[in-house]
Amino acid sequence: MKLKTGAGAAFIGVMASATLAAADEEPKYGGTLTYMIPADAPPSFDGHREATYATVHSAAPYYSVLIRVNPDNPGSASDFVCDLCTAMPQPTDDGKTYTFKIRDGVKFHDGSLLTAYDVAASWNKIINPPEGVTSARQSFYIMVDKIETPDPLTVVFRLKFPTSAFLPALADPFTWIYKKETLDKDPHWYEKNILGSGPFKFVEYQAGHSIKGERNKDYHHKGLPYLDAITGIYADKQAVRVEAIRSDRAAIEFRSLPPSAVDELVGALGDKVTVQTSDWNCALIVTPNHKRKPFNDARVRRALTLAMDRWHGAPALSKIAIVHTVGGIVFPGSPLAATKEELEQIAGYWPDAEKSRVEARRLLKEAGADGLSFELLNRSVDQPFKYLGIWLVDEWSKIGVKVTQRVLPTGPWFEGLRNGSFDVAIEGNCQSVINPVLDVSKYQPHSVFTEQYGNFDDPHDIDLYQSMLNETDPAKQRALMRQFEKYVLEEQTHEIMTLWWYRIVPHRSYVKGWKIGPSHFLNQDLATVWLDK
């Protein structure tokens, strides 16, 4: 049953019917959900530090957040609900003050009470991390002036300027609430340990194998969770994960599988498997290390993007990998995204691939980089890292560039990115809630965005971004986004976009209560999941 054919269209109709039927069913309590995590291990357990699904899928069920996207409507960019707060507040002070009341009686898993002081301490670690502590999304919150706690059950966020980007940023799923007492003693403690107030209590972690949790009987959302226990199994090989679902040793992988693997499962299991699909706020990018020659030369960086024929590559790759759409730096189809006509004006997106490659060869010669060879740092994850890596090596060979790959497990790969030990790297810009202005903040220098690995300084880049962030007129903001996009992708080629992803999640049909969203980071606390068996 092919997802791209008429049969696939019928298949999607079946999926919709199944979802509607599930909504009318009474949830059942009990059972253990076993799910696959497509990684060898998370780089750490600290959600504030990390930017990978390996951390979220491992530890999100053990934590609470202040607010979140509605788990019944995870595709929304504006439907936010309280987790630890009692009600979504209306902003005051001309949109610059948000006051949250915190639920009374919430407990951490060690039995201690969670208060506004814990919420404020966690958010201060995210927004203003102490020296030596990494905060992956610190730049998302540059609009925040200060956080106040007038009493144990009240948290007040005061902004420097009003912006519609604030609430979506506050709903980021990595913003777990930690215990203030623990953070005061050691802000690095949560990198290797788990202690939260989420729907499940942490039980056991076996490095490279599994992570287990049990139902939190004191969970602050009455009646949840439904499951008795959860077990996440680590496996970086796709074949292992597919076979686990086929043989019912696992029920689901929350990230995504490619069409070929989904077809295999549907063919083998029929109505015993259900498939959910969604556009995906995620794309792999190619990051040149500006501190290594010749990648300090914009002409060389531009040659690499000109070599890539995205328009013909996307249809072919979408048959075997979880990629789908040609796009710029903004989530395709969203109001601030470039149209196809606008994209075609940017180097690397020209309709004529041969014209692009002629220009690429000219630039390499002009820069004295004829016969260029380099090493590409890649991640040891099949989808879509390895597939994109093979494609990139082939594309670059068409302009006479020779590339070898250094493929590393998730932890060492992240370490290589962070310490700059690479020529060029494949990495990702994968966000959660669709929030275009903040989603593109990654394309600023490391001094502003800590998870920027290109090692460049560029005040003009920062100025362009700040102008866009502070602009409240939608049309003017869109025009500024086009300027920023062309500057990042062509004029300086600080980053090189590959393709945007498409999320396809097959799961055992007895798994109910989970809905797919535009990000593999969303809806992962598993509180509403139940098993119909």
PLM regions with names:
Residues I67-G75, A171-P225, A229, V358, ...:
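Gly/Pro-rich hinge or "lid" segments in bacterial periplasmic/extracellular proteins
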Residues K4, A21, K28, K101, ...:
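Surface-exposed binding/hinge segments that line
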Residues M36-D93, N124, N193-G196:
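N-terminal lobe/hinge region of extracytoplasmic solute-binding protein
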Residues A87-G132, V156, R241-A244, P294-D297, ...:
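Aromatic- and charge-enriched surface segment that lines or borders ligand/interaction sites
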Residues K146-I147, V203-K212, T231-R292, P315-A316, ...:
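Extracellular/periplasmic solute-recognition and catalytic clefts
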Residues T52-Y53, H57-P61, Q206, S210, ...:
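Detector for C-terminal structural segments
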Residues T34, T115-S122, P152-R158, G198-P199, ...:
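Alpha-helical secondary-structure segments
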Residues I142, L195, T231-E243, S256-S260, ...:
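Short helix-initiation/N-cap motifs at beta->coil->alpha
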